[in-house]
Structure formats: structure tokens, C-alpha cells
């Protein structure tokens, strides 16, 4: 099995534009390592758009463990110096992670080529085939 081809990850100006249109704090929440997420964001030239990376080596547990989501919420509240409830828009390709997110009352967005099957999963708020299409549609709503 060949290694991950980081050099093939290049800037996507449309993705950058779409992310910039959302004037909200953005976070990466991944089961990958911090270094993996950081290298990908840097290669895409979008690292500066994210406030923090939550990764397998920076939080106590991984998705879909509900304690993982709780620790991310607590850290965001701590870092934003607020106790008020935040609205979390959570994008993921794995249904089990989205199910846990819905248990935390997060707004769930499934990114999958099977997005048309959304109706089968009551814990999904939205479903799109790609992150860019999701951002285009969600910008009209939020």
C-alpha cells in the first residue's frame, strides 16, 4: 500500500472562496492525527481559516464516542470564553459520527455520493455529494 500522497493535494480556490463566505469560527474535528490534518490544510492553503484542529492526538477520545464530541464542545466554549450554547454545523462522511453529533443537537451534514439516501437516516439534517456543493447550498440558508 503506497503512502499518502500529500504532494497531490493542491489549493482549491473555489473551496477557499466558499469557506471565506462563512463568517463563523471553523474547526477541524478528525480521527486523523493533528499532523495529517495540518499538512492537508496547509497544502490546500486554508489553514488560516480554521481556529483549531481537534484530532486523535489532541482530544481524549475519537468519533463516534459521544465523550469526544462533548470534549470538543467544552474546548470551544473555553476558547471562545463563553458559556452560551453554540450552533454546531458538523460535516462528515460517516453515518455513525453524524448520529452521535445529532445526539448533541448539532446540525448534521452528510457528505456522500449516496446523499440521496438521506431520508433513511432521521438524524441527518442535510446531505450533499461534495463539501463544495454543501457549502454553496448552506450559504443560502445560514
Task: Indicate where each model-derived feature is located.
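Small/polar loops that bind or transfer phosphate-bearing groups
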Residues: 28-29, 92
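Short, acidic loop-to-helix structural element flanking the phosphoryl-transfer center
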Residues: 2-28, 34, 38, 66
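Asp-based, Mg2+/Mn2+-dependent phosphohydrolase catalytic module
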Residues: 34, 38-142
Amino acid at each position: 500500500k503506497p503512502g499518502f500522497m500529500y504532494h497531490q493535494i493542491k489549493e482549491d480556490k473555489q473551496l477557499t472562496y466558499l469557506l471565506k463566505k462563512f463568517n463563523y469560527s471553523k474547526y477541524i474535528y478528525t480521527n486523523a492525527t493533528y499532523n495529517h490534518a495540518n499538512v492537508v490544510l496547509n497544502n490546500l492553503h486554508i489553514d488560516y481559516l480554521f481556529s483549531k484542529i481537534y484530532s486523535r492526538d489532541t482530544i481524549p477520545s475519537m468519533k463516534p464516542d459521544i465523550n469526544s464530541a462533548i470534549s470538543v464542545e467544552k474546548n470551544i466554549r473555553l476558547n471562545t470564553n463563553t458559556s452560551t450554547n453554540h450552533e454546531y454545523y458538523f460535516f462528515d462522511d460517516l453515518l455513525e459520527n453524524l448520529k452521535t453529533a445529532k445526539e448533541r443537537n448539532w446540525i448534521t451534514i452528510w457528505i456522500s455520493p449516496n446523499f440521496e439516501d438521506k431520508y433513511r437516516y432521521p438524524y441527518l439534517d442535510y446531505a450533499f455529494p461534495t463539501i463544495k456543493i454543501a457549502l454553496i447550498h448552506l450559504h443560502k440558508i445560514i
